[in-house]
């Protein structure tokens, strides 16, 4: 039995499958030129599988606009997902722009600057 607060292996498997299927559907079914190149980073499911937070990054488009478009199309993507997945409850989808990549780049820049300053002082 899983510990309280831990994510079950079934939850992880379903999250991974949803991520793969959604990535394919966004690329093949939406074909919205305003989206640019969308990459799904992760899917977080609630324990009852009723809701999914889908985190994405985007290239070639404004993140806020891409988030709005994806959330607008969430119902359509949900219906496509329902046809693909063979589970009792297909979660409602909510899309969020993942800013962790930008934060990692910023942190890397700061570390490089600190190292450059330190080497000048030596």
Swiss-Prot record:
Transmembrane segment boundaries: none
Matches recorded under SUPFAM superfamilies = Ribosome-binding factor A, RbfA (SSF89919)
**A GO CC term attached to the entry:** cytosol
Give the record's GO biological process terms: maturation of SSU-rRNA
Coiled coil, from the record: none
Q: Which UniProt keywords apply?
A: Cytoplasm, Ribosome biogenesis
A GO molecular function annotation here is: ribosomal small subunit binding
User: Which compartments is it annotated to reside in?
Assistant: Cytoplasm
Pfam families with a match to the protein in the record: RBFA
NCBIfam families noted in UniProt: rbfA (TIGR00082)
Q: Which family does it belong to?
A: Belongs to the RbfA family.
User: Which PANTHER family does its entry note?
Assistant: RIBOSOME-BINDING FACTOR A, CHLOROPLASTIC-RELATED (PTHR33515:SF1)
Q: What does this protein do?
A: One of several proteins that assist in the late maturation steps of the functional core of the 30S ribosomal subunit. Associates with free 30S ribosomal subunits (but not with 30S subunits that are part of 70S ribosomes or polysomes). Required for efficient processing of 16S rRNA. May interact with the 5'-terminal helix region of 16S rRNA.
State the oligomer form and interacting partners: Monomer. Binds 30S ribosomal subunits, but not 50S ribosomal subunits or 70S ribosomes.
**What protein is this chain from?**
Ribosome-binding factor A
| Species of the source | Cupriavidus necator (strain ATCC 17699 / DSM 428 / KCTC 22496 / NCIMB 10442 / H16 / Stanier 337)
Organism classification? Bacteria, Pseudomonadati, Pseudomonadota, Betaproteobacteria, Burkholderiales
State the encoding gene. Answer: rbfA
């Amino acid at each position: 039995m899983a510990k309280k607060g831990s994510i079950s292996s079934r939850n992880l498997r379903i999250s991974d499958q949803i991520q793969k299927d959604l990535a394919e559907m966004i690329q093949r079914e939406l074909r919205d030129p305003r989206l640019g190149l969308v990459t799904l980073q992760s899917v977080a499911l609630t324990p009852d599988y009723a809701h999914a937070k889908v985190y994405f990054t985007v290239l070639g488009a404004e993140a806020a606009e891409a988030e709005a478009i994806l959330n607008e199309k969430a119902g359509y993507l949900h219906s496509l997902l329902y046809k693909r997945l063979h589970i009792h409850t297909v979660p409602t989808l909510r899309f969020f722009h993942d800013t962790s990549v930008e934060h990692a780049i910023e942190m890397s820049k700061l570390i490089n600057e600190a190292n450059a300053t330190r080497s000048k002082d030596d």
